[in-house]
């Protein structure tokens, strides 16, 4: 395991796998209501903690901001400015998408 117990709801500004300073830091924003955003955040931390990636988490619950970006599902993960995950998908699918991204 790369970090301690990484399966938890990520806090605003928290960095997943922060000790991996040799890999780029990616910025992600989760758009949606607090409950679904928290579920996606926890699912993300569990699904990708073993991958060589660092993610800085931010949250945005503004419907206006989401609509302006073309977001259609709640919650949605925007990774480095691009819509990456829409909806509360399974952890295995999250892992697969990040493996392909890397």
Task: Give a label for each model feature.
Residues 1-7:
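Helix-enriched interaction subdomains in cytosolic or periplasmic regions
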Residues 39-43, 72, 89:
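Generic recognition of short, well-ordered alpha-helical segments
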Residues 80-102:
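Non-catalytic, surface beta->alpha helical segment in thiol-disulfide oxidoreductase systems
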Residues 41-44, 54, 93, 98:
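Non-catalytic interaction surface on structured domains
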Residues 9-50:
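Local sequence-structure signature of Cys/Sec-based thiol-disulfide redox active-site neighborhoods
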Residues 70-77:
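Structural micro-motif
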Residues 53-65:
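Thiol-based oxidoreductase modules, predominantly thioredoxin-like and allied folds used
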Residues 32, 58, 86:
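Small/polar loops that bind or transfer phosphate-bearing groups
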